[in-house]
């Protein structure tokens, strides 16, 4: 009976762990969709800000700047096999995690999964030369870390400064 009880406890712990992992994955997807909606002006500014605030994300800033990171390995436009699509999604998730970690640590904005296995970054701050340099430095850090960990290259596109959500590109 004691062995049976231990087995049940172990199964319960495994279910809780799986539930927690599923929740984390879903939270990232929900967060990314909300950020993508803000960047793409899908909802009004107020709707986006309220949705993001409910997720614990504050986007109030003097200026914004968007960057997109694209894995070079998968961006040549050729048809991807199911296996390559899965690999691409996994590498994109690694890129997202690296980006999210660095951008959060630098307190420069937020990262999100932008679809098509791309990762977006919404940089928030004051339009200064120092912040401009910090953004470029962060992009290089992400590029270098991905190269170091996965031996992968990325292309980076950085948009222009925007004072409002409508100006984001």
Residue ranges and their predicted role:
Residues 141, 156-163, 169:
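Cyclic nucleotide signaling catalytic output domains
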Residues 110-116, 144-156:
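Catalytic core regions of nucleotide second-messenger enzymes
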Residues 2-137, 162-164:
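Interdomain helical linkers/hinges and coiled-coil/dimerization scaffolds
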């Amino acid at each position: 009976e004691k062995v049976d009880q231990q087995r049940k406890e172990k199964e319960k712990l495994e279910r809780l762990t799986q539930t927690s992992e599923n929740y984390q994955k879903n939270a990232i997807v929900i967060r990314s969709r909300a950020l993508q909606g803000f960047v793409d002006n899908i909802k009004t500014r107020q709707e986006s800000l309220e949705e993001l605030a409910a997720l614990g994300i504050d986007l109030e800033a003097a200026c914004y700047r968007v960057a997109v990171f694209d894995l070079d390995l998968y961006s040549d436009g050729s048809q991807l096999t199911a296996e390559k699509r899965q690999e691409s999604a996994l590498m994109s998730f690694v890129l997202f995690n690296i980006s999210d970690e660095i951008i959060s640590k630098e307190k420069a904005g937020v990262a999100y999964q932008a679809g098509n296995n791309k990762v977006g970054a919404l940089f928030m701050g004051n339009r200064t030369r120092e912040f401009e340099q910090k953004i470029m430095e962060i992009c290089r850090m992400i590029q270098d870390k991905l190269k170091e960990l996965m031996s992968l290259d990325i292309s980076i596109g950085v948009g222009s400064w925007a004072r409002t959500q409508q100006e984001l590109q």
